[in-house]
């Protein structure tokens, strides 16, 4: 039935129902008409059979609205009332009755300053007003929804709270900013919702909320209303101490973990371990192993398990796989209370093409470039953020801020930075567009990274911003004031590639590859490096680290222990992927748990014990970390002994008296009466030896201290004579007086 009324202008009803009426709040809700002589209320409630207007003050009925058409449009005058008042709608459906606050009576909750900063590209907390946020508005509690869709004709939110009706809650349009918002009272935590967007082409697309803080488990993709309660943090002392922290002169031994496959539970090991179990098992394990940092591979919601989290759709939503957001907070809180810093792998380089995600969000290339030569990433068939667009920068800045602020992460590791820096990254000559100077540098991405790092360090002193950057781009860890990118650390991909290639050679031929062990020291102090043996080195058919090494098991395990000894004593912070600490035999499989049963075998237990002791040694002796990024913290004693596959070097702390001498032998030959130069006339003792029987070695060790002889050697005034273990690493320290012993 349709009632002829003067409540709607001609054509407005059809435009509203067809998703083409942009200024919905000028039509629906309470409005003064007839030059202020009357009040009318208009509403669109599909499925309703009658609607009454009640006074919110006393609950009395003011008017019954007329049904304008069969699509759920109702309208009516408020009797003699001419002054606006707060009201409720009593809606009668065929099987039930509902009392609701009409969302179209509420004004916008958007703050002009927030909107301005968002549009300027400098907003760091966009998540406080976009997405779904609990608010109290004119004494009414509810959820404020806000989304950016500047080219949409109409945006509606639909969900469990309105029976997924895409006409029930159409958002208010703010043309100047491109934002749409609405306040809805009748919403409950964990209800699902999506946005129905009438795009610029007249099509309707259904999208997840880019700022959703929780999402449905895959393969579903609805966003979820957050819980109201806040988490009660217990790490205030940690954060206070972190603010004065100087990470470059502190030990940093990072354990990289993918939570989905570290350890699973259930009879078939297919059930994810939740945060409570990770608190009980992973945190004590990290502490026992002596790692100072935990790095989580991406945990923003991702639909495809095989992406390992590197193709996130819900950038603000911790994945459902391990529990809720407060479970993640509790996990990080416990890490902090146990003295473990937590880093997050963050992916601002690209995003996937999932239709419910950011791709052509409002029918236009909103978050990505419209030209595929700038907007598409050929390696992963993903899309590249438009770093030159202010609102996109605000989105990404805010996401970084969100994880550091809301979850107390101690830093971010940025994935695939090289792909951001170069316009021609993985492209043929005809597949990219030069910058305005004719070069291949992505000036917009460079500016974004510089601003990101500067802002995050300013907001969160003591954090670490880390780049996975695989080229020779200069100044990755230089200050932005010096035209650098402003990162705190950079992964040393060159060291990783060279040394893995070296250990994959048969010892007989390593003499011809000796430079692959030594070349890293040519550039070791040009950046602030992290030596990384990450997940990327044990996937896609590359095999495990153990698998890369030739020879029988004795040679494989001995070489791996020696290699770890070289890594832990080489300048640079450390990162080791899970499973490598006990020499997993198979390459990493994201669909199953690590092979923990291997620890019942002595060689694997020996490698784990070796890594644990390396971490303890590393933290105990400042010479191994204080001058990681300064050339005066390192000295070659012998880097030219290629024929014997031997390296000898010395590490120094701030105090030159604090030093460590390292001998690495990458041949299976034992060297007796081997002379090593030392800086002082003191006795030296063998602190660690990878060939010790405790680690599964042949026990070619130096049990007794060696007296320094006044025999200049290798550029040093004194020397000692030792036995060098086969395929081994031997670490030596001077026997200091008790008061001079290094401390953590």
From Swiss-Prot:
- Quote one Gene Ontology molecular function term: 1,4-alpha-glucan branching enzyme activity
Which cystines does this chain contain?
none
- Would the keyword Transferase turn up in this protein's UniProt record? yes
User: Which GO cellular component terms, listed alphabetically, does the Swiss-Prot or TrEMBL entry include?
Assistant: cytosol
Pfam families the record matches: Alpha-amylase (PF00128), Alpha-amylase_C (PF02806), CBM_48 (PF02922), GlgB_N (PF22019)
The family database entries (SMART domains) matched by this protein are listed as: Aamy
Active site at 415, 468
> In which pathway does this enzyme or protein participate?
Glycan biosynthesis; glycogen biosynthesis
Q: Name one GO biological process term.
A: glycogen biosynthetic process
Mind listing the UniProt keywords for this protein, alphabetically?
Answer: Carbohydrate metabolism, Glycogen biosynthesis, Glycogen metabolism, Glycosyltransferase, Transferase
Q: EC annotation? A: 2.4.1.18
Q: Which reaction does it catalyse?
A: Transfers a segment of a (1->4)-alpha-D-glucan chain to a primary hydroxy group in a similar glucan chain
Function according to Swiss-Prot or TrEMBL: Catalyzes the formation of the alpha-1,6-glucosidic linkages in glycogen by scission of a 1,4-alpha-linked oligosaccharide from growing alpha-1,4-glucan chains and the subsequent attachment of the oligosaccharide to the alpha-1,6 position.
Q: Describe its assembly.
A: Monomer.
Stated family: Belongs to the glycosyl hydrolase 13 family. GlgB subfamily.
The molecule here is called 1,4-alpha-glucan branching enzyme GlgB
What organism is listed for this UniProt entry? Shewanella frigidimarina (strain NCIMB 400)
């Amino acid at each position: 039935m349709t009632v002829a009324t003067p409540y709607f202008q001609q054509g407005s009803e059809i435009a509203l129902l067809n998703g083409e009426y942009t200024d919905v709040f000028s039509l629906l809700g309470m409005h003064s008409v007839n030059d202020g002589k009357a009040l009318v209320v208009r509403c669109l409630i599909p499925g309703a059979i009658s609607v009454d207007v009640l006074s919110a003050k006393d609950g009395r009925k003011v008017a019954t609205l007329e049904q304008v058409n069969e699509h759920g449009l109702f309208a009516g005058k408020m009797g003699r009332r001419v002054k606006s008042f707060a009201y409720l709608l009593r809606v009668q459906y065929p099987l039930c009755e509902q009392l609701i606050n009409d969302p179209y009576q509420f004004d916008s909750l958007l703050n002009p300053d927030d909107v301005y900063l968002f549009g300027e590209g400098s907003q760091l907390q966009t998540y406080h007003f976009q997405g779904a946020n609990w608010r109290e508005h004119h004494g009414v509690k509810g959820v404020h929804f806000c989304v950016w869709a500047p080219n949409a004709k109409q945006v509606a939110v639909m969900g469990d709270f309105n029976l997924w009706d895409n006409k029930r809650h159409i958002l208010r349009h703010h043309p100047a900013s491109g934002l749409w918002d609405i306040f809805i009272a009748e919403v409950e935590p964990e209800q699902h919702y999506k946005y129905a967007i009438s795009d610029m082409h007249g099509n309707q697309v259904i999208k997840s909320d880019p700022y959703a803080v929780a999402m449905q488990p895959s393969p579903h993709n609805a966003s979820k209303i957050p819980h109201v309660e806040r988490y009660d943090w217990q790490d205030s002392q940690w954060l206070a101490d972190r603010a004065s922290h100087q990470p470059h002169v502190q030990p940093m031994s990072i354990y990289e973990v993918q939570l989905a496959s570290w350890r699973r539970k259930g009879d078939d090991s297919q059930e994810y371990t939740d945060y409570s179990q990770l608190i009980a098992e992973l945190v004590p394990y990290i502490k026992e192993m002596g790692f100072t940092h935990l790095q989580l591979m991406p945990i923003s919601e991702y639909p495809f398990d095989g992406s390992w989290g590197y193709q996130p759709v819900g950038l603000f939503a911790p994945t459902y796989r391990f529990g809720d957001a407060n479970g993640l907070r509790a996990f990080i809180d416990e890490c902090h209370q146990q003295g473990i810093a937590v880093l997050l792998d963050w992916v601002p380089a690209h995003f996937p093409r999932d239709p419910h995600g950011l791709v052509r969000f409002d029918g236009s290339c909103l978050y990505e470039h419209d030209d595929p030569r700038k907007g598409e990433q050929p390696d992963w068939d993903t899309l590249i953020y438009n770093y030159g667009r202010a609102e996109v920068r605000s989105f990404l800045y805010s996401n970084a801020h969100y994880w550091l602020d809301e979850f107390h992460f101690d830093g971010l590791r940025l994935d695939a930075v090289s792909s951001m820096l170069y316009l021609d990254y993985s492209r043929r000559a005809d597949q990219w567009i030069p910058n305005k100077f004719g070069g291949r540098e992505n000036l917009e991405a460079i500016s974004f990274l510089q601003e990101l790092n500067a802002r995050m360090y300013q907001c969160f002193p003591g954090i670490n911003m880390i780049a996975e950057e695989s080229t020779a781009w200069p100044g990755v860890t230089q200050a932005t004031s010096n035209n650098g990118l402003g990162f705190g650390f950079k992964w040393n991909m060159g060291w990783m590639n060279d040394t893995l290639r070296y250990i994959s050679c048969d010892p007989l031929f390593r003499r011809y590859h000796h430079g692959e062990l030594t070349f890293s020291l040519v550039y070791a102090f040009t950046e602030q490096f992290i030596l990384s043996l990450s997940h990327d080195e044990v996937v896609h058919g590359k095999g495990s680290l153990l698998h890369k090494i030739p020879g029988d098991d004795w040679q494989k395990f001995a070489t791996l222990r020696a290699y770890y000894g070289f890594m832990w004593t080489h300048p640079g912070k450390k990162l080791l992927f899970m499973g490598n600490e006990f020499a997993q035999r198979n390459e990493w499989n994201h669909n199953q748990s690590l092979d923990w049963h291997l620890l019942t075998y002595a060689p694997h237990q020996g490698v784990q014990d070796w890594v644990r002791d390396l971490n303890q040694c590393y933290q105990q002796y400042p010479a191994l970390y204080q001058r990681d990024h300064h050339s005066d913290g390192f000295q070659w004693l012998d880097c030219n002994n290629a024929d014997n596959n031997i390296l000898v070097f010395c590490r120094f702390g701030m105090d030159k008296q604090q030093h460590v001498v390292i001998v690495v032998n990458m041949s299976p030959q034992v060297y007796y009466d081997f002379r090593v130069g030392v800086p002082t006339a003191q006795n030296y003792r063998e602190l660690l030896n990878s060939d010790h029987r405790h680690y599964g070695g042949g026990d070619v060790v130096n049990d007794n201290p060696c007296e320094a002889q006044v025999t200049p050697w290798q550029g040093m005034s004194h020397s000692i004579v030792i036995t060098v273990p086969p395929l081994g690493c031997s670490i030596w320290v001077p026997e200091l007086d008790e008061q001079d012993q290094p401390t953590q």
